[in-house]
Amino acid sequence: MIFQSFILGNLVSLCMKIINSVVVVGLYYGFMTTFSIGPSYLFLLRARVMEEGEEGTEKKVSATTGFIAGQLMMFISIYYAPLHLALGRPHTITVLALPYLLFHFFWNNPKHFFDYGSTTRNSMRNLSIQCVFLNNLIFQLFNHFLLPSSMLARLVNIYMFRCNNKMLFVTSSFVGWLIGHILFMKWVGLVLVWMQQKNSIRSNVLIRFNKYLVSELRNSMARIFSILLFITCIYYLGRIPSPIFTKKLKVKETSETEERDVEIEKTFERGGTKQGQEVSAEEDPSPSLFSEEKEDPDKIEETEEIRVNGKEKKKTKHEFHLRFKETCDKNSPVYETSYLDGNQENSKFEIFQLFKEKKEEKYLLWFEKPLVTLLFDYKRWTRPLRYKKNNRFENAVRNEMSHYFFYACRSDGKERISFTYPASLSTFLDMIKKNNYFFATEKLSSDEFSTHWNYTNNQKIKNLSKEFRNRLEGLDKGSLIRDILEKRTQLCNDKTKKKYLPKTYDPLLNGPYRGRIKKFFSPPILNTTYIKNKIRTPWINKIHNLIFINDYHEFEQTIDRFNRKSFSSEEVRSLLTEREREHIDSEDRIKSLNFLFDAVITDPNDQKIRKKAIKEISKRVPRWSYKLIDNVYQELGEYDENVRGKHAFRSRKAKRLVVAVDHQTKGDVSLPHYLEQSDFRRYIIKGSMRAQRRKTVIWKPVQANAHSPLFLDRIDKTLYLSFDISQLMKVILRNWMVKNKNQKLSDYTNAKTRKLDKKEKKKLKGERYQRQEMVRIKQAEGWDKRLLTRILRSSMLVIQSILRKYIVLPLLIIAKNVVRILLFQDPEWSEDFKDWNREIYVKCTYSGVNLSETEFPKNWLIEGIQIKILFPFHLKPWHGSTIQSSHKDPKSEQETDVCFLTIFGLETDMPFGSPQKRRSFFEPIFKELKKKIRKLKTKSFIVLRDFKEGKIKELSKINLREIEKLRETQKNSIISKQMIHEPSIEISSMDWTKLSRTEKKMKDLTNRTSRIRNQIYKITKEKKKGSLTQETNISSNKPTYSVKILDPSKRIWRILKKRNARLIRKSYLFLKFGIEKIYRNIFISTLTIPRINTKPFRESTRKQMKIIEKNIHNNEANPERINKTNKNRIISTIQKLISKTSNKNSKISCNLLSFSQSQAYVFYKLLQVPILNFYNLRPVLQYHGTSLFLKNEIKDFFEKHGIFNYQLRHKPLWNFGRNTRKHCLSGHYQYDLSRIKWARLVPQEWRNRANQHCMAQNKDLIKRDSYEKNGLTHYEKQHFFEADLLRNQKSNFKKHYRYDLLSYKSLNYEDKKDSYIDRSLVQVNNKEEYYSNYNRKKVKLLAMLGSISINNYIGEDDIMDMEKFLYRKYFDWRILNFCLRNKANMEAWVDMDTGTSSNQNTRIGSNNYQKINAINNRVPFYLTIHQDEEINPSTQKGFFCDWMGMNEEILSCPISNPESWFFPEFVLLFNAYRTKPWIIPIKLLLFNFNGNSKKNRTGKKEADLFISPTQKEYFELSNQSKEENELADQGTPRSDAQKQVILGSVLSNQEKDGEENYTGSDMKTRIKKKQSKRETEVQLDFFLKRYLCLQLRWRGAVSFREKILNDMQVYCHLVRLINPSDVAIASIQRGEMSLPILITKKKFALKELTKGGMLIIEPRRLSVKNDGQFFLYQIVGIALVHKNKRKITKRYQEKGYVDKKDFDEFIAKHQKMTGNRNKNHYDLLVPETILLPKRRRELRTLICFNSKNQNGMQKNPVFFNNGKGGGRVLDKNKNLAREKNQLIQLKFFIWANSRLEDLICMNRYWFNTNNGSRFSMVRVHMYPRLKIR
């Protein structure tokens, strides 16, 4: 078995080696190349198939030989560079393919030049066989394009980059191609034989067999192939840039030798610079080389190597390599000349050589240059390239050069090809290799280099570990920390004065991110002071010496060329003209600037050369040799003389939308209006071949939209024969439903179908509207396609307007009134002509913008015009009264108020719309005639009715007895009919089975009616018998009383009979309506109950909670006051519970307020149980995730007050290592950041809070010491720590070790006892204790809102690049008044709403607002929302409800009150979100809100981030002077509370201002009061600048474009009218002007607009460009606590805050603190922090790259020795072992598991990369999840 497995393993490995070998891969790629069929296959197939006989065999052999030889040349060209250059250039195809294809076409088409039948014995001398060979050979060299693509042919080229043995790979790929070719030809032969043997194919019914068909086909084969080749030729013309049919760009260059010589001599005299170029281009009237192009002197030398007849020519323009440098003054650019060879004399010689070459080139290439440019310039404009404009250079860089390219580099110990290798590095490396003979030329193999790489890394690890161990040993010996810590080396500028460079300029601190110090001196200062102070030995660039070692000895002493006296002589200036004097002055200025960089100065003391210049390795970038502009710049050229010419590239089709006309400048304010069609142009240069475009392809015969080939798979490709199955099913179902329409459905289904019919009608209406809109757009595009159509339409519209106004309408008025006169009616001349005068013709632009009645738009005949008719005239037969007109439909009035004129003189609603259907002139006439006819009919009917009534009266005179007899007989007949009717029903009921469904229902209905009728008859008969007298004489002739009573009963019976039948028929509907009515009444009554009772309940709860807040905060003075004042059962139960579990004298924090009524309700429900076992809540409180039943506030409140079992804190915690990242991060509030913060990595102030949480206040949950006794001590420590932190915060802000948060905080939490790095800074004394890990979660983002400005969380961290733009901030626009004229209005922008409490013991909070008076100091304007819970009830209503004066009306509304008793904790964040939207994530709204008024003093530390640098200096000075005073004022808690300042309010005491007014209200304004005069101007400037950072969004269904543009059209028209009131009223009535948008007040506040819901103005995020320095200073870090971080003063040491001896003692997080209560303990300091961050990163990286441990984390060998824990540093406290706690194990690794943002952050920071695309250079291995031993 072992032998078999051994053999099997060897076989598998052998097979893998064979598969991965170069030969097999080459065979595979060569075989794949066979399927790339090109045009050469046509000749090969013709020779193989059509040729017969001996000559045919020879032609087959020659075709096959030429085919194989051509393919072999293609493979060899891959390896052989000269052949590749000859066949790979685009001009090769242009030279070879087109003439050869055209020759074949004209050779084979008209006649045969060679007789294929006559052959000689020597077949090689036969020209036809040679042509067959050449055809197959040459066509094989062309590009493969036919089937399927050229990608298969390029597979071999691509794999060449990865292959080491290239020649073997080329050979094997050729063999593979040969095998594939032989197989393909054999397959073709088999197919042909099969087709000859198949008689069914030859004798097809559709193809009539002809015995001469084969011979005719064989004779015409040459012609068929010539046609195919002609098609190929045309296809190549589409793909290759043809120099014949394209548009030429005119590059204007003068060819006069004298002017060119003069220009070159001028540049030669100026030392190779073109300093006078701009001046000569602007002022010299004579044309020069640069005068026509108006180019900057930034043009880069452009060289192209051209191979013509084996010679290389060099075409060079006189453009010298200049680099543009921006100086401090942007208006005065300085040009710095940089020579690649570093020698100025050599540059002069090179310029002279270029001058001579240019003169020779002029004579040699006077006829060759045009031909060469036309045929071989493959970089010309005909390529489908986009013209990319670069603002720093005049000409644009070609879009064909990549910033990176392929290059072999070493990565992870192996040589790999990097496709993102910087070009400058490879250029630099090549220069060093050529010039430095010390450079190693031999190449190491990959294995040797990997071994060498590993050896080097191991040596580095040993050295670093040894140094690290030595430092730790020194720490164990008790050495000072300042001696142990590694120091940074800082570059000193002066040894005596010890002036250090700024951090941004120090190369030892910032490396490649340092900047350049720009110092400028005038020439006299340079000669006097600069040289005296800088007498030193010369410093020569070592890199320059290394690269240009041959040119180093050619340096010689030169005298300063610049001498100002030679240019400022008045004698010389008097001899020159004014133009020449200006010319020389401009040259002086440019020379003086250039002198700062290029002058070679001679030091008289040491006679050494000092060259003040910066050598930079730069690359020549190919640029366009011409400057192109678009149509926008072409229009600007009409006003700007510097921009001239016609646009040379095609931009998107657009029309000028003229919004208004500026009468001062006499110009139009226009916007581009783009047509609603796809953009096929895509800014392609004119004349470029569109068929060569790769990103916009056309694959259909007719294609409406431009698509990219990347998204072709997402486009529905519908075939011609395809059909939609769903539509077909709909048609079938519809037909089936039509067949069964005779079946009567129920009323319910009928109602449903009616609803569906309504929906379908709406849908059809919308589709009809869309169809009309599409027709309108097509008409507009049709008119817009041609210039002639627009001219024709514009002229037709003007003619139609004149005809309509002055000819047609007056003629109609005359005709109408003449007819009225003929009909003897009054004429209406005045009314008609009044309406005619009211009609106004407004000239509009092509897109419909109103201009004026008289003036035409600019270029209206070419661009087009629209004519809008206001109050169009409609001829009326008569003018009615106002009463009749008031009943008209307002919609019809709106339709007729405005319209557009068509070219046929008709009216339409919108431009290019269909004509409107107007009311006919005769329609009201016909209506009136119909009314008169109807009245006539009614009158005639009345006459006839009267006549009929008279006849009836005459008939009533008949004898009554005869009538009675008739009645009796009628009665008998009715009874008899009833008797006969019943059996008929019974008889017919026997045939029910044969009846239809409807007939059955009718029978049932008749039976029911007959039954009811009989019952009614019986009942009436019985009643009649009881009511009548018994003396009834039936035989008497006179009618008795009983007979008279029977008549009304019969009538009643008949009425009931009809109504019962109707009631039975409609019973279903009655029942339905009744049920709906009952349901509605019940439902509405239930809805009204909470609406009635909610308001008083909410008022009562609000009052109760205010009492709760007041009582809870005042329980220090009166602990029993709560039970007296609060009679509510909820709070009394809570208070009893708290009193049982905590000391009565302890301070109850205000966490209760955070969950307000809603949490109180939950407490009430929990505490209703009389005996509550809190041990049952243990799993709920222990779980650190999201609880399903309890909110986080309840859980944290229970934990803080020790309500649950105290032993819980000693139990093992939740295992975060097995949780997901969400649980891991949510369990620790340091990670409670928004996604925006994690994405941008910009939490500046949060890093200071990460290590300094809240100061603990209880020793242990068992002891629960009261806070009241030692409150001042806690405040002192907090205050002094903050004061010290404030002074050092600016320096801490720029520390390098911000990356530590990501590396230290990313530890795996599976082992709970190893989570020490997460521990925060805690200062402990006898009365204080730290928070344990289980309740760490309580300090949430919202928990700090009481002490820290909420803007620290929502504003500061989310603005990018806050280092550079600290004064740029979000701004709230909802409170600003638009009138910026008065300072009073400025101060009224913000409501100074401060709230205080009457009790002195309570610490007072306020509404921390800021005045805008400090804006001129560039202080960020932000609004701090209310942060304290102890607010007066009178002001609390204003806090929640009347926020910034925005909700005066909403305050009285009980439903929309923000202070909802359901979610009161959302109010603070909601208000902050309204101040700065899109900052607070939704996730944070559900976190804790534990505001503590005691923490208000800590707010100064975060607010320092918002203070400008000038204010900070003042603030630091004031803090230093007040520290002594604050120590004296710490006598009692009451005096300390009185020291608290109402934040945001303006106090007179400057000491308090400096202490608490940290929000930067107007600190510097009080120091410099003179600046208040310019305050309004600065505020206005502030207003306008912030306006640019906002975006506007409209609320409502109407889009912004439609609503605003409609109003703008009306406004632009009203401005031009003399009396616009009538037109304005009419437009308001028509709905064209929206009154909410129309601003009528001069002074208004934006809150009125936002309150109405019309406008929503939201801030837009600032956009800045991120560079390396941004990522350097914005990376998240943790504040390390050591002496360099915190300068510990003597006061701290006296108070016991810092103890040096306890600095290195580390306490486990879950260990009891009973033995160490009197000691101070800090965060666990990672010992590696002794090293500098750079060395620390290097050590960890080397450990991770070289460690082979796969079972655990990557460990530091200093601490981990065979699984043993820590060193002596960590073993000092031996009590840890007695408590059965494991020793601390420090586990380090580079990045966290599965956290890509950490990897990106560290990647950029560690490897100094500021570009995301360079991450592929750093091949970092993502380790799997690390395990715990």
Curated annotation (Swiss-Prot):
Residues 260-301 are annotated as: Disordered. It comes from the Eukaryota. Coiled coil: none annotated. Part of the Tic complex. InterPro entries: TIC214. This is Protein TIC 214. The keyword Plastid applies. Signal peptide: none annotated. There is a partial copy of the N-terminus (positions 1-363) of ycf1 in the inverted repeat (ABI49067). The chain crosses the membrane at residues 18-38, 67-87, 90-110, 127-147, 174-194, 224-244. It comes from Citrus sinensis (Sweet orange). It holds the Pfam family Ycf1. PANTHER family: PROTEIN TIC 214, PROTEIN TIC 214-RELATED. It is a multi-pass membrane protein. The keyword Transport applies. Residues 260-272 have a biased composition (Basic and acidic residues). Involved in protein precursor import into chloroplasts. May be part of an intermediate translocation complex acting as a protein-conducting channel at the inner envelope. One of its GO terms (biological process) is protein transport. It is found in: Plastid, Chloroplast inner membrane. Belongs to the TIC214 family. Its main location: plastid. Keywords: Chloroplast, Membrane, Plastid, Plastid inner membrane, Protein transport, Transmembrane, Transmembrane helix, Transport. GO terms for cellular component: chloroplast inner membrane.
